[in-house]
């Protein structure tokens, strides 16, 4: 098979591992810089050009799109879809999962366990917003933040009011969530591929830190997840429409709660912690499921 990996840096661990795994399985792997792709939209002949050449003959595309280029990146994935190339994750699913608020709204509607979450626009509603999530301590998150950036733990009500008001004053959209103290600064990253959890790790926050992101000094270790946690991760990925997802779960007194569903989960932490060939399993999923893509848009035949 001829497989494209959309990545801005071919030296990144995840990109290198996918190339290695694909080539080991006998596939032709191409790392393509997302931002160097440009598109031609002509009746019945959508094209992607890359560094002066037309991209042709690809069977599948693996999107590794950073949050800062979501709009352009999903447009490129969508163009591959229009060309009939199988996307590991569809463009609409990537867009859906990147919108934190939309993700939680969809998961909430389907009954997936979540931390109590509030969202408001007016500073006048801050007091009730805090009450909504059972008061302080609480977590304040920028909707555009990634890797733990833009996440604040407010220990007191007064601190929460000040931080939320400051964000609102800067026209920064934030959501407020209950603080799951019993999680002890740890979360579980479940790596879902093709409707199955193929690997899971526990991420523990560094001392004095409540964010467990590995980019913020957290540590990772192998963990045995419960059947309920496994089912929750699979369901969350399915609701987002993602074939490949990193589902972040906290253990709370009222069962597993989903914090985030990541459409471009990194491989280094999970492979190191679990000693599993996650990249190889992702390639096997492509071998099994890749087929000419047909758009799902109503009224469209192709």
From Swiss-Prot:
* Annotated residues for binding of Mn(2+) 1: 248, 260
Provide the Gene Ontology terms for cellular component: cytoplasm
Among InterPro entries, the record links this protein to: ATP-grasp (IPR011761), ATP-grasp_RimK-type (IPR013651), ATP_grasp_subdomain_1 (IPR013815), RimK (IPR023533), Rimk_N (IPR041107), Rp_bS6_RimK/Lys_biosynth_LsyX (IPR004666)
Residue sites binding Mg(2+) 2 per the record: 260, 262
Needed cofactors: Mg(2+); Mn(2+)
Keyword check for Manganese: yes
Positions with a binding annotation for ATP: 141, 178-179, 187, 211-213
What is the top-level taxon of the source organism? Bacteria
Residues annotated to bind Mn(2+) 2:
260, 262
One GO biological process this protein is involved in is:
SOS response
Gene Ontology MF annotations: ATP binding; metal ion binding; ribosomal S6-glutamic acid ligase activity
Does this entry carry the keyword ATP-binding? yes
Query: ATP-grasp domain location, by residue?
Result: 104-287
Tell me one Pfam family matched here: RimK
Top enzyme class: ligase
**PANTHER family reported for this sequence:** RIBOSOMAL PROTEIN BS6--L-GLUTAMATE LIGASE (PTHR21621:SF7), RIBOSOMAL PROTEIN S6 MODIFICATION PROTEIN (PTHR21621)
Q: Which family does it belong to?
A: Belongs to the RimK family.
What is the name of this protein? Probable alpha-L-glutamate ligase
Report the source organism: Alcanivorax borkumensis (strain ATCC 700651 / DSM 11573 / NCIMB 13689 / SK2)
């Amino acid at each position: 098979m001829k497989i494209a990996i959309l990545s801005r840096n071919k030296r990144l661990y995840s990109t290198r591992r996918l190339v290695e795994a694909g080539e080991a399985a006998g596939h032709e792997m191409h790392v393509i810089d997302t931002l160097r792709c440009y598109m031609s939209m002509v009746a019945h002949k959508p094209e992607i050009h890359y560094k002066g050449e037309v991209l042709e003959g690809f069977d599948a595309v693996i999107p590794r799109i950073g949050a800062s280029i979501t709009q352009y990146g999903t447009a490129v994935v969508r163009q591959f879809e229009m060309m009939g190339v199988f996307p590991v994750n569809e463009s609409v699913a990537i867009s859906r999962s990147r919108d934190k608020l939309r993700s939680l709204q969809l998961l909430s509607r389907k009954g997936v366990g979540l931390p109590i979450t509030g969202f408001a626009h007016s500073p006048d509603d801050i007091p009730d917003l805090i009450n909504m999530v059972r008061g302080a301590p609480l977590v304040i998150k920028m909707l555009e933040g990634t890797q733990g950036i833009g996440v604040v733990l407010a220990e007191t009500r007064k601190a929460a009011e000040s931080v939320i008001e400051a964000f609102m004053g800067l026209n920064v959209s934030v959501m407020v969530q209950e603080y799951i103290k019993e999680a002890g600064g740890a979360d579980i990253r479940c790596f879902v591929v093709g409707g199955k959890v193929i690997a899971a790790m526990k991420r523990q926050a560094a001392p004095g830190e409540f964010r467990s992101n590995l980019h913020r000094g957290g540590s990772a270790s192998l963990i045995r997840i419960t059947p309920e946690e496994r089912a929750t991760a699979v369901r969350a990925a399915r609701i987002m429409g993602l074939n490949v997802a990193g589902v972040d779960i906290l253990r709370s007194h009222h069962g597993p709660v989903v914090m985030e569903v990541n459409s471009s989960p990194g491989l280094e932490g999970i492979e190191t912690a679990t000693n599993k060939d996650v990249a190889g399993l992702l390639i096997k999923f492509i071998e099994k499921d890749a087929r000419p893509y047909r758009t799902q848009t109503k009224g469209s035949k192709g």
